[in-house]
């Protein structure tokens, strides 16, 4: 499904467009670069998915990152608590832009360390787009000693989170050690970790999906439509629900 990342996709998202950024990246990786004759980019996805920009906007950019607000379209605005991109609208945009060749299987439920481990390990061939609260993550630059300890099976404390917002990011793979595992998370800000990638213990990813801030998190598992039925079976085997979650966005 996945080709080399398109050079037409910028390295960093525009402010508040994390969901559209990842939708654009996975669509372009699947060879889809236009939608109804228009060039496919995060701005077009944001417009079609009903993304709401926060008004006022104070805190949308993590420390150390540049603010990018050169939007191609006039996007609607809402109070910060209601801003963002709704998971259901984002899934619809991905499927429509792909003209039905891609399918998003939405997964929600009680996220646990074991479910995260099993999902990331077994969902090979799919793209996992996670809607999280970043404040539950470790900071993106833990020391080598901390990472090695986790892989040995020790439960250690990582650095505090870099920021605390609702966010979309990709869960790419599972790294196993002799006693533990770490999830490779790919962020839309290359200032995090190693060019946007950082390692998180599965329990931190589970906590980020649980959120505990009055909103819900979840995962969009994206795969070619003709090969997507196994993702529903996997979700059920893991005890997850198939359905869209409420991330608080009113779009």
Q: Where are each of the predicted segments found?
A:
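N-terminal start-of-chain detector that recognizes signal peptides
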Residues: 77, 100-103, 141-146, 154-157, ...
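Active-site-adjacent substructure of cysteine-protease-like catalytic cores
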Residues: 112-185
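Short, charged/polar low-complexity linear motifs in solvent-exposed/disordered segments
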Residues: 37, 147, 201-204
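Solvent-exposed loop/turn segments at secondary-structure junctions
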Residues: 25, 134-137, 190-191
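Noncatalytic regulatory segments and standalone regulatory/sensor domains
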Residues: 152-166, 170-251
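Cysteine-nucleophile protease catalytic domains, especially the papain-like/related folds used
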Residues: 2-126, 223, 228-250
